Swiss-Prot record:
InterPro entries (UniProt xref): Ribosomal_Su5_D2-typ_SF (IPR020568), Ribsml_uS5_D2-typ_fold_subgr (IPR014721), RNase_P (IPR000100), RNase_P_CS (IPR020539)
Protein name as annotated: Ribonuclease P protein component
Catalytic activity, reaction form: Endonucleolytic cleavage of RNA, removing 5'-extranucleotides from tRNA precursor
Biological role: RNaseP catalyzes the removal of the 5'-leader sequence from pre-tRNA to produce the mature 5'-terminus. It can also cleave other RNA substrates such as 4.5S RNA. The protein component plays an auxiliary but essential role in vivo by binding to the 5'-leader sequence and broadening the substrate specificity of the ribozyme.
PANTHER family, alphabetized: RIBONUCLEASE P PROTEIN COMPONENT
Assigned EC number: 3.1.26.5
Subunit text: Consists of a catalytic RNA component (M1 or rnpB) and a protein subunit.
Family affiliation: Belongs to the RnpA family.
Highest taxon in the source lineage: Bacteria
Enzyme class: hydrolase
Biological process annotations from GO: tRNA 5'-leader removal
Highest classification ranks of the organism: Bacteria, Pseudomonadati, Pseudomonadota, Gammaproteobacteria, Enterobacterales
SUPFAM superfamilies xrefs: Ribosomal protein S5 domain 2-like
């Protein structure tokens, strides 16, 4: 059985890595989601999530959104440039998105960073 997962090396894990992205980021915005990115020298893309309770109150909703973000990143990470990405939520309306709509919005964001 071939397991597909997001390896630990593909995630931003500490504060300094997040700060690095926020210092001089490229930004791409959709309705409610902002993607910050910055080139890295590792040769592969990495992802970090910053989803606050201010915009997504309930944990089960934050978890659903994070699950979809990680899954869309995992499926297209091999086509992305070597960058560090941080996704933030900037609208309370995102909790009303159906899963399909959320995935379409995320795929639009990743499309901007293809090779």
């Amino acid at each position: 059985m071939n397991r597909k997962f997001l390896p630990k090396r593909a995630r931003l894990l500490n504060l300094n890595e997040f700060i690095f992205v926020f210092q001089k980021p490229e930004r791409v915005k959709t309705t409610g989601i902002t993607l910050f990115s910055r080139s890295n020298r590792l040769g592969y893309p990495r992802i970090g999530l910053a989803i606050s309770k201010k915009y997504v109150k309930y944990a089960h909703e934050r978890n659903r959104i994070k699950r979809h973000i990680r899954e869309t990143f995992r499926t297209c990470q091999h086509n992305l440039l070597a960058k560090d990405f941080v996704l933030t939520i900037r609208s309370k309306e995102i909790i009303y998105y159906k899963n399909k709509t959320l995935i379409q919005e995320l795929e639009k964001l990743w499309y901007h960073h293809l090779c």
